[in-house]
From Swiss-Prot:
Enzyme class: oxidoreductase
Domain description: Has a modular structure: an endo-beta-1,4-glucanase catalytic module at the N-terminus, a linker rich in serines and threonines, and a C-terminal carbohydrate-binding module (CBM). The CBM domain is essential for binding to and subsequent oxidative degradation of polysaccharide substrate.
Full protein name: AA9 family lytic polysaccharide monooxygenase A
SUPFAM superfamilies: Cellulose-binding domain
Enzyme Commission (EC) number: 1.14.99.56
Role of this protein: Lytic polysaccharide monooxygenase (LPMO) that depolymerizes crystalline and amorphous polysaccharides via the oxidation of scissile alpha- or beta-(1-4)-glycosidic bonds, yielding C1 and C4 oxidation products. Catalysis by LPMOs requires the reduction of the active-site copper from Cu(II) to Cu(I) by a reducing agent and H(2)O(2) or O(2) as a cosubstrate.
Record-annotated CBM1 domain positions: 315-351
Chain residues that bind O2: 182, 191
Lineage: Eukaryota, Fungi, Dikarya, Ascomycota, Pezizomycotina
Family: Belongs to the polysaccharide monooxygenase AA9 family.
Main location: secreted
Native source organism of the sequence: Podospora anserina (strain S / ATCC MYA-4624 / DSM 980 / FGSC 10383) (Pleurage anserina)
Length: 351
């Protein structure tokens, strides 16, 4: 049996045991829509489309756990391989990165963006050779009392990041990531969701920031990884290296509207300087009322204890859904075949 067939069978047999978190669906830049790799469909297609996003064994929309932060899985997700094409953008452009499905309300945490120069075609680059520098990293905002992941949800499940205007032209990989901290108070409880996309950046800049290997970005016990997000006023240190000179933690967030779609640019194609679309619109994100139930996936759970007998809360929480925790007002009774289990004082889950 082929490796792909074996993986397919494993994924199908485990379908009932997993629940979606998310992946990047597409990006919008200068009004142009570029499709990302879809791990929930493209993996199963004999001839998937050529896209800008890196493929990964993320069929469950799952995560990379802290115990694997020293492995190549943290670079661009599990067993990631380069996308077959790229999107051409200008240095200084703003890129809207759109996730699917809706990011869970419970999965609070930072949103972090990196770039790495491929020094050649990104479509064939060795991911271990990439050196990442941070161009954005937003955590907890004490003024709004929101996490960056909250802001992403409120912004239509999208995040706006800006390419440095003085960046040297070349082929780069954009590494965009959410780190969910709902289980972060326990060892190996944080969840990293790295997503990688190939960019061909054009411009006249000469800035070539130094970077670090992907396997050196984080450690399992870093202050921003092993962290309790449920304290009254979190003083949260965004993990990873410092922002490059001139970068900010995040730019003002707005939603972007695509006016046309484009296919990934294949290696060796002529460089065409992109121009802004004539009717691209952006708007401040409306406040999105979060749902009262969530679905989560756990690939490995920290030591747990049985939850107290469920009380209050209407309805039934699905397997892998939240069923308790300080302040929780949703369902506390689990679906048949699962038990409400305490992961920490703030989060209990049907396991």
């Amino acid at each position: 049996m082929s490796n792909k067939a074996a993986t397919l069978l494993a994924a199908l047999s485990g379908a009932a045991l997993v629940a979606a978190h998310g992946h990047v669906s597409h990006i919008i830049v200068n009004g142009v829509y570029y499709q990302n790799y879809d791990p929930t469909t493209h993996f199963y297609q004999p001839n998937p489309p050529t896209v800008i996003g890196w493929s990964a064994l993320q069929q469950d929309n799952g995560f990379v756990e802290p115990n694997n932060f020293g492995t190549t899985d943290i670079i661009c997700h599990k067993s990631a391989a380069p996308g077959g094409g790229s999107a051409t953008v200008n240095a200084g452009d703003k890129i809207s990165i759109v996730w699917t499905p809706e990011w869970p309300e419970s999965h609070i945490g930072p949103v972090i963006d990196y770039l790495a120069n491929c020094n050649g075609p990104c479509e064939t680059v060795d991911k271990t050779s990439l050196r990442w520098f941070k161009i954005g990293g937003a955590g907890y905002n004490p003024n709004t009392r929101t996490w960056a992941a909250d802001d992403l949800r409120a912004n239509g499940n999208s995040w706006l990041v800006q390419i440095p205007a003085d960046l040297k032209a070349g082929n780069y990989v954009l590494r965009h990531e959410i780190i969910a901290l709902h289980g972060g108070s326990s060892p190996n409880g944080a969840q990293a969701y790295p997503q990688c996309l190939n960019l061909r950046i054009v411009g006249n800049g000469n800035n070539s920031p130094a970077g670090v290997a992907g396997t050196s970005l984080y450690r399992a016990n870093d202050a921003g990884i092993l962290f309790n997000p449920y304290v009254a006023s979190p003083n949260y240190p965004v993990p990873g290296p410092a922002l490059i000179a001139g970068a900010v933690s995040s730019i003002p967030q707005s939603k972007s509207t695509a006016t046309r779609t484009a296919s990934a640019t294949l290696p060796g194609a002529p460089v065409v300087t992109p121009t802004a679309g004539p009717v691209v619109t952006t708007s401040s994100a409306p406040v999105v009322q979060p749902p009262t139930t969530t679905l989560v996936t756990v690939t490995s759970a920290p030591a747990t204890s049985a939850a107290p007998a469920p009380t209050g809360g209407a309805g039934v929480a699905p397997k892998w859904g939240q069923c308790g925790g300080n302040g929780w007002t949703g369902p506390t009774v689990c679906a048949s075949g699962s038990t409400c289990t305490v992961l920490n004082p703030y989060y209990s889950q049907c396991i």
